[in-house]
Amino acid sequence: MESDKIAFKINNQLVSVKPEVIVDQYEYKYPAIKDQRKPSITLGKAPDLNKAYKSILSGMNAAKLDPDDVCSYLAAAMELFEGICPEDWTSYGILIARKGDKITPATLVDIRRTDIQGSWALAGGQDFTRDPTIAEHASLVGLLLSLYRLSKISGQNTGNYKTNIADRIEQIFETAPFAKIVEHHTLMTTHKMCANWSTIPNFRFLAGTYDMFFSRVEHLYSAIRVGTVVTAYEDCSGLVSFTGFIKQINLTAREAILYFFHKNFEEEIRRMFEPGQETAVPHSYFIHFRSLGLSGKSPYSSNAVGHVFNLIHFVGCYMGQIRSLNATVISTCAPHEMSVLGGYLGEEFFGKGTFERRFFRDEKELQDYEAAEAMKIDLALADDGTVNSYDEDYLSGETRSPEAVYTRIMMNGGRLKKSHIRRYISVSSNHQSRPNSFAEFLNKTYSSDS
């Protein structure tokens, strides 16, 4: 019988079947650009900028905006934000601009236009008798792009969180160098009338383009990023969490991965570090690949690397970090096992610093210190024949090497120690847990064991 089949009987008849499950039909797509062309979108005919401003502002005051017209205006307004490229700018082999070139957000991408006219003449704006200033254009652009940030705020945020964010954004765009163009609470009212701006591909594309530009080019109106910053590393929560994790525990990526004692990490680590990506390149298209439409399904999201994501946030919970306690558990990625490993790693890296003298009064004191430290190391390495130094190293609990941590987990039967459980309960029980959060998981799973 084939090794991938199972055998059983039905009504005394032998049956052999091959168990198969549904395969994820959506393949992860990496954002590498292979055709050497800038990311592109197609919009309607470019409007008269001043007429478009009046029409869009009128629609905003009435809390009724047409997404196509908004996108057409935002693309046309890019010409107002000219800046100087600080360095040669390339990404995925594409030359974006040379050092010293005058550039606008439109330089970063390819915006194609059709002959389809927008509904500018029908959308009002007759009450504006003068043409807007650049400061007023900048305020409108900033307010429109802020609809993206508001639409990305999770419903799990309680109270008036979103309203407070909207109010602070309005305050930014009514003070210099911007100009007040709307009444208080207009932004939130407009958002409520259409709360799904982040799902509109062209709007997302333009938000990412503006953010990529203002993140690199020093500009008078760089505060526009307040509404677009959420496009940076969008759908990269797995990779972003891993980056924060290694900084937190003061290890390199290579050193940290040596502590990932589970077979399900293998595929995720391979996925996260696919060759050919510009994950470590500043100002790359990679940073905004999701908003620029370069990937339909991110291989760096929390769902794509769920075991890594779960482990990192269980360690964060052990350390009492609010962000980790509030994060959503990936329930399909072995949360119980990840909580065990997270407990051991949390114990190793929580409240244990690595300290050494680095500054001295003079060169002689430095040399004396180095000589004394070298002598200590020689003595520590000397084997007096009475103790197996290898066993002592791994069983004493005084080392945090991957081998030592793994040995301690195995010696405890792959289970958490009572001290781990007490710590988990201590941090999670004092936290107002959100549905499906790590705090809720720890409370439900370990409260009876404390």
Curated annotation (Swiss-Prot):
Which terms in the GO cellular component ontology are assigned?
Answer: helical viral capsid; host cell cytoplasm; ribonucleoprotein complex; viral nucleocapsid
Single GO term (MF): RNA binding
Report the leader peptide range: none
Summarize the PTM comment.
Answer: Phosphorylated by host CK2. Unphosphorylated protein N seems to have a better affinity for leader viral promoter encapsidation. Phosphorylation of protein N in ribonucleocapsid may stabilize the interaction with protein P, thereby playing an important role in viral transcription/replication.
Residues modified as Phosphoserine are S389
Which Pfam family name is an example for this entry?
A: Rhabdo_ncap
* UniProt keyword annotation of RNA-binding present: yes
In its keyword annotation, does this UniProt entry include Phosphoprotein? yes
| UniProt cross-references to SUPFAM superfamilies, sorted A to Z | Rhabdovirus nucleoprotein-like
Q: Where in the cell is it found?
A: Virion; Host cytoplasm
Alphabetized UniProt keyword annotations:
Capsid protein, Helical capsid protein, Host cytoplasm, Phosphoprotein, Ribonucleoprotein, RNA-binding, Superantigen, Viral nucleoprotein, Virion
Further remarks about this protein from its record: Displays a superantigen activity in human and mouse, activating mostly V-beta-8 subtypes of T-cell receptor.
Similarity comment: family membership: Belongs to the lyssavirus nucleocapsid protein family.
Its biological purpose is as follows: Encapsidates the genome in a ratio of one protein N per nine ribonucleotides, protecting it from nucleases. If expressed without protein P it binds non-specifically RNA and therefore can bind it's own mRNA. Interaction with protein P abolishes any non-specific RNA binding, and prevents phosphorylation. The soluble N-P complex encapsidates specifically the genomic RNA, with protein N protecting the genome like a pearl necklace. The encapsidated genomic RNA is termed the nucleocapsid (NC) and serves as template for viral transcription and replication.
Quaternary arrangement and interactors, per the entry?
Answer: Homomultimerizes to form the nucleocapsid. Binds to viral genomic RNA. In nucleocapsid, binds protein P and thereby positions the polymerase on the template. Protein P acts as a chaperone on free protein N to prevent it from aggregation before encapsidating genomic RNA.
Q: What is this protein called?
A: Nucleoprotein
Source organism per UniProt:
Australian bat lyssavirus (isolate Bat/AUS/1996) (ABLV)
- Quick one: which gene encodes this? N
